[in-house]
A protein has these predicted regions:
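Juxtamembrane/disordered regions of integral membrane proteins
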Residues: 1-146
Length: 146
């Protein structure tokens, strides 16, 4: 199984778009409240331009997609289910555990941890499924018939 760069690009883009939906449409109000921002502070952050942060977030989404594709290749996951299970294991083993330290040692609210890690969990499950199941189309040359 080779790395499918088209799948990595689509998976990274999907993860990035999910982040936009997650933190705007789905969880904007609780996220802002848990961050301790006033509505004015949140508006100021938006007005000051989020483009550099969004660009970096897109690049990190691509890096995550590529790293996940490497892990899937290493374990030989070739179905959506297998890809999602590998992503779940990586999420539980690295993301959820590492981010829990922000609750324990930085006094961040548990709700913020749940919002942030819910995004990573849903995103990684989707990326794992997509990356493992996406099959590269091969050109089919019909057999010569006489």
């Amino acid at each position: 199984m080779r790395i499918n760069y088209a799948a990595v690009g689509v998976a990274g883009l999907a993860y990035w778009v999910l982040g936009g939906i997650w933190y705007s449409l789905l969880f904007a109000r609780p996220f802002i409240a848990l961050m301790g921002w006033t509505p004015e502070q949140a508006a100021a952050i938006q007005q000051n331009g989020e483009e550099p942060s969004l660009a970096v977030a897109f690049v990190t989404s691509l890096v995550l997609a590529y790293a996940l594709a490497l892990a899937l290749r290493f374990v030989g996951a070739e179905t959506a289910r297998a890809g999602a299970l590998v992503a779940l294991a990586l999420f539980a083993g690295f993301v959820a555990t590492s981010n829990l330290e922000t609750v324990l040692f930085e006094s961040r609210p548990l709700g913020l941890y749940l919002i942030n890690n819910g995004y990573h969990l849903v995103g990684m499950l989707g990326m794992g499924a997509l990356l493992a199941a996406w099959k590269r189309r091969e050109a089919r040359v019909p057999a010569y018939q006489t």
